[in-house]
Design a protein with these regions (language model features):
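Short beta-strand-to-loop junctions in surface cap/lid or active-site-entrance loops
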Residues: 1-9
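Cap/lid segment of the alpha/beta-hydrolase catalytic domain
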Residues: 8-86, 92, 126-136, 140
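Loop/turn elements at helix/coil->beta-strand transitions in domains of secreted/extracellular proteins
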Residues: 9-12, 39-42, 91-94, 115-119, ...
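Generic beta-strand/beta-sheet core signal
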Residues: 2, 46, 98-100, 105, ...
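Primarily recognizes the serine-hydrolase "nucleophile elbow" in alpha/beta-hydrolase
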Residues: 81-147
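The feature captures the conserved acid-bearing segment of alpha/beta-hydrolase catalytic domains
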Residues: 119, 131-184
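Alpha/beta-hydrolase-fold serine-hydrolase catalytic core, especially in secreted/extracellular enzymes
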Residues: 8, 159, 166-212
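Alpha-helix capping and helix-loop boundary segments enriched in small/acidic/polar residues
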Residues: 20-31, 63-74, 97-108, 141-154, ...
């Protein structure tokens, strides 16, 4: 948990980690959390189930199972429950979720499962043609339910609440500016809220969630 030194109520950001080396102990990950805290938000950073620190408890093989898809989603909801129940410095009207790669997939899934989130920022993850390359992202084939859907459609369920989608030119999110983002804009338009969804495209970058 990273928290501001200032008193009063603060926004809360739930931050599911992605498939990056060293998990939540990675230097740039800690720098990002500390920066968000200095900006005034309480942040909770946690590893995916069976990944990083979690692998020390349940083993790395547990991560590559369909059950991981469910368990890590529940972990995000339970963390939110815990923070709201036990922290007096949280503003329940300002709850964000932000993760990269597999953490970005979790970001979208959490917005679908829990309407307490008021802002979301999936990073290097959102695509209409790729559900995630790990069973922890697609082990429970939710994209095949009800005749079929995709992560872009799941993200659109968050409208009209604010969403920032970060994409790059070196992975499957390269299509976001011409495919997924216009679709999201169209859905947000139905709510008169096109100003609430935005995309930052970094064409020279690759698949990471580093200090840049």
């Amino acid at each position: 948990v990273y928290a501001p030194r200032t008193k009063g109520k603060h926004a809360l950001i739930i931050c599911p980690n992605g498939h990056f080396g060293q998990g939540r102990y990675r230097k740039d990950q800690q720098q990002r959390m500390a920066t968000l805290a200095r900006m005034g938000a309480v942040c909770v950073d946690y590893d995916l189930y069976g990944w990083g620190e979690s692998a020390l408890q349940v083993g790395g093989k547990a991560h590559h199972t369909a059950d991981a898809h469910t368990i890590q989603a529940m972990n995000g909801i339970w963390i939110l429950d815990y923070m709201l129940a036990n922290r007096k410095d949280i503003d329940p009207a300002c709850i964000g979720v932000n993760g990269g790669s597999g953490g970005g997939t979790q970001t979208v899934l959490l917005t679908v499962l829990d309407d307490r989130f008021t802002a979301a920022a999936p990073v290097v993850s959102l695509a209409s043609h790729f559900d995630g390359g790990c069973p922890c992202e697609s082990g429970k084939p939710i994209q095949l339910a009800g005749g079929g859907t995709c992560n872009a459609e799941l993200a659109a369920l968050f409208a009209p609440r604010p969403m920032l989608v970060v994409s790059d030119g070196g992975d499957w999110t390269a299509t976001v500016p011409r495919l997924e983002y216009p679709y999201l804009q169209r859905i947000y338009c139905f709510y008169g809220a096109t100003d609430k969804v935005s995309n930052v495209q970094l064409p020279q970058e690759r698949h990471d969630f580093g200090p840049n």
